[in-house]
Design a protein with these regions (language model features):
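C-terminal cap of thioredoxin/glutaredoxin-like
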Residues: 27, 38-47, 134-244
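A short beta-strand-turn-helix
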Residues: 2-22
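An acidic- and aromatic-residue-enriched active-site/binding cleft used to recognize and process polar
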Residues: 29, 62-64, 200
Length: 244
């Protein structure tokens, strides 16, 4: 966990930081297993600490397909499920069970939908992001597809689906995704997930130390050398202090 106080102050405030003290920024991709784990633990910690309704999660796009110039390889994703999933089974994990040709080739439309849902409030964007993650990781649904995204939105019971559909059709949130990608590749966002607080405190892949053996992502498999799920409590307590 690091603190970058220079980025948090003055006229040159870092755009990667939250706009308000009561929000926690999380840069991530929806089909990143470590981000799925992190978001599950963030939600659990917020509930445990009694901070629901006081601290919000501002989802920012870290599009792996744009960083890598390719689809997030399914062999790599599959190799992570049993390893990362074992750290928090309740998050919802299953190997892909739908036909192979329905595996998501992109998560950009889904990430755009999460940004569009912010117009309806933090509750809506949080619920949609969590629903889309579960749709992919647990339910083997193709979150590349517009109708699947809207179905998931309807299932949240908090997202206004017609409003979201209009935003997707107009592309009103697409520029936000690309702006977040640009800010992420400028240097301070190291990976998916990377968590930022209003004062510059941040943590990349919180609590996890991981390495790949017998090949890189898509060839070998991950080994978790360290896992500390308690790191989320001090992060959220600090966010609550900043929020006042």
């Amino acid at each position: 966990m690091t603190v970058d106080t220079a980025a948090a102050g003055g006229a040159g405030r870092d755009p990667r930081l939250p706009h308000s003290a009561d929000t926690v920024v999380v840069y991530s991709d929806l089909n990143c297993s470590f981000a799925h784990l992190a978001m599950h633990r963030l939600h659990e910690a917020r509930h445990r600490l009694g901070l629901v309704g006081r601290i919000w999660f501002d989802h920012r796009a870290f599009p792996l397909e744009l960083f890598n110039g390719s689809v997030n390889d399914r062999p790599g994703v599959d190799s992570e499920i049993s390893v990362v999933g074992a750290l928090a089974p309740a998050a919802g994990w299953r190997l892909w069970r739908s036909p192979d040709w329905t595996y998501p080739v992109t998560t950009l439309p889904a990430m755009e939908a999460v940004q569009a849902a912010k117009a309806q409030g933090w509750l809506a964007s949080e619920a949609l992001a969590r629903g889309l993650r579960r749709a992919f990781w647990a339910d083997s649904r193709c979150i590349s597809m517009r109708h699947v995204i809207l179905d998931v939105a309807a299932e949240t019971s908090v997202v206004e689906v017609n409003e979201l559909a209009a935003a997707l059709d107009s592309g009103s949130a697409r520029s936000a995704v690309m702006a977040q990608f640009e800010s992420a590749r400028a240097g301070r966002v190291r990976c998916s997930p990377h968590v930022f607080l209003h004062d510059g405190m941040n943590s990349a892949n919180p609590g996890i130390t991981v390495r790949w053996v017998n090949g890189d992502f898509g060839v070998g498999f991950p080994v978790i050398d360290a896992d500390d799920p308690t790191v989320y409590d001090p992060l959220l307590r600090r966010a609550a202090e900043l929020a006042g």
